[in-house]
């Protein structure tokens, strides 16, 4: 499918698109992506290649060790990664979130070069068992004892925790100011992974199998007193600047899955012959794919608008939430249509289609459930808060 955004791109953005496509064709061909998904393996060599070529440092200032650029550039790389291996696109988005959090805080700036180069990996530990989208219900505690924080609790659905050098942990360090301000008293801490008080287990999911999803148990884990990111008791404030970006880049993952699935289905229906010719000549096959292409193009424009709004410094909470909602719902419908066009062949282990179908499911409830996204959009329209 032709790229509807091609005519709107700056020259450097088109060059970036061609660069990441070339890198992936050489270092992450489809058969290797399939093996990584099947074997649930994080491809560290591909990750480091992305770092060597400046992809991991996008969105981080050059003077601090990054590659410059903004959300629009990060969205390009995210989308192209998701075309090939959506799991790695998830990890890429989390890498960018960590980088932006560090930069926004004005602290721990020495961590940026290693992150941008791919030599070091940092993970976010926010979600907890039973917490879901209700982040404020977390139970992990951090208590300051002398010159160290002592951390106890557990986290779930944490990408790349087993590969990480450092873990950014959201924990309660102080009591909330009131029952109506549960966000107060939460702090974000940088915690060294390799210590006796941290146990990490991989969690085998049917979706995003190569993303390295883990659970973490903290039992008297330690972090230095200087580990706070931002201000003590204002951990959500330290994260807030990344939320809109995360939603836009999550939408870009949906776009990448959609483009990959649609391109695969189009090739298949043009080559597969039945009843005297290619099955792509039948309207019953054409119309669902045409509808999918139209919806994907519309979602792409919304994602592009949200990304450029953030880069321009404009308020974009509504735009980013809408982009996440529309793109993820779009790809959910799209993979249903494209997989039906391919029939059983699309569900064969050797086909990328079955991977797109599985991975598209995550987009409906991650990084935030679409029902909550609808409530966020409704609140932005002036309706009463419902959560």
Where are these regions (language model features)?
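Short Ser/Thr-interspersed hydrophobic loop/turn segments at strand-loop and sheet-helix junctions
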Residues: 54, 77-82, 171, 191-195, ...
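Short glycine/proline-enriched turns and hinge-like loops at secondary-structure junctions
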Residues: 69-71, 134-136, 160-164, 180-184, ...
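A short core secondary-structure module
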Residues: 148, 152-198
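Flexible, small-/acidic-enriched active-site or ligand-binding loops
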Residues: 137, 194-224
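A short, charged helix-loop
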Residues: 214-241
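N-terminal glycine-rich flavin-associated loop
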Residues: 89-108, 132-135
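A short, Trp-centered hydrophobic/proline-enriched beta-strand micro-motif
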Residues: 118-126, 170
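Alpha-helical interface subdomain recognition
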Residues: 1-84, 88, 114, 118, ...
């Amino acid at each position: 499918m032709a790229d509807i955004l091609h005519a709107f791109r700056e020259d450097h953005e088109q060059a970036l698109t061609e660069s990441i496509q070339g890198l992936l064709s050489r270092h992450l061909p489809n058969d290797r992506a399939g093996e990584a998904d099947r074997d649930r393996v994080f491809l560290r060599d591909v990750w480091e290649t992305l770092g060597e070529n400046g992809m991991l440092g996008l969105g981080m200032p050059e003077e601090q060790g990054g590659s410059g650029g903004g959300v629009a550039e990060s969205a390009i790389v995210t989308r192209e990664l998701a075309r090939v291996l959506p799991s790695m696109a998830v990890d890429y988005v989390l890498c960018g979130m960590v980088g932006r959090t560090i930069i926004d805080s004005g602290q721990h700036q020495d961590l940026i070069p290693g992150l941008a180069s791919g030599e070091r990996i940092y993970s976010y530990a926010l979600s907890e068992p039973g917490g879901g989208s209700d982040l404020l219900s977390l139970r992990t505690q951090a208590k300051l004892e002398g010159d160290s924080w002592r951390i106890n609790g557990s986290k779930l659905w944490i990408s790349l925790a087993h590969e990480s050098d450092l873990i950014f942990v959201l924990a309660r360090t102080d009591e909330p100011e009131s029952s109506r301000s549960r966000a107060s008293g939460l702090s974000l801490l940088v915690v060294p992974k390799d210590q006796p008080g941290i146990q990490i287990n991989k969690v085998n999911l049917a979706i995003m199998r190569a993303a390295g999803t883990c659970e973490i148990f903290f039992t008297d884990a330690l972090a230095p007193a200087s580990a706070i990111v931002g201000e003590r008791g204002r951990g959500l404030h330290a994260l807030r600047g990344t939320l809109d970006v995360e939603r836009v880049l999550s939408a870009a993952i949906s776009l990448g899955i959609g483009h990959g699935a649609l391109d695969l289905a189009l090739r298949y229906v043009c080559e597969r012959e039945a009843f005297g010719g290619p099955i792509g000549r039948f309207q019953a096959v054409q119309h669902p794919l045409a509808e999918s292409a139209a919806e994907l193009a519309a979602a792409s424009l919304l994602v592009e608008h949200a990304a450029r709004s953030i880069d321009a410094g404009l308020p974009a909470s509504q735009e980013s939430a809408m982009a996440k909602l529309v793109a993820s719902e779009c790809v959910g419908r799209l993979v249903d249509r494209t997989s039906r066009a391919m029939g059983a062949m699309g569900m064969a282990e050797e086909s990328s289609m079955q991977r797109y179908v599985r991975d598209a499911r995550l987009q409906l409830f991650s990084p935030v459930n679409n029902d909550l996204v609808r409530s966020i959009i409704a609140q932005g329209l002036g309706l009463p808060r419902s959560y």
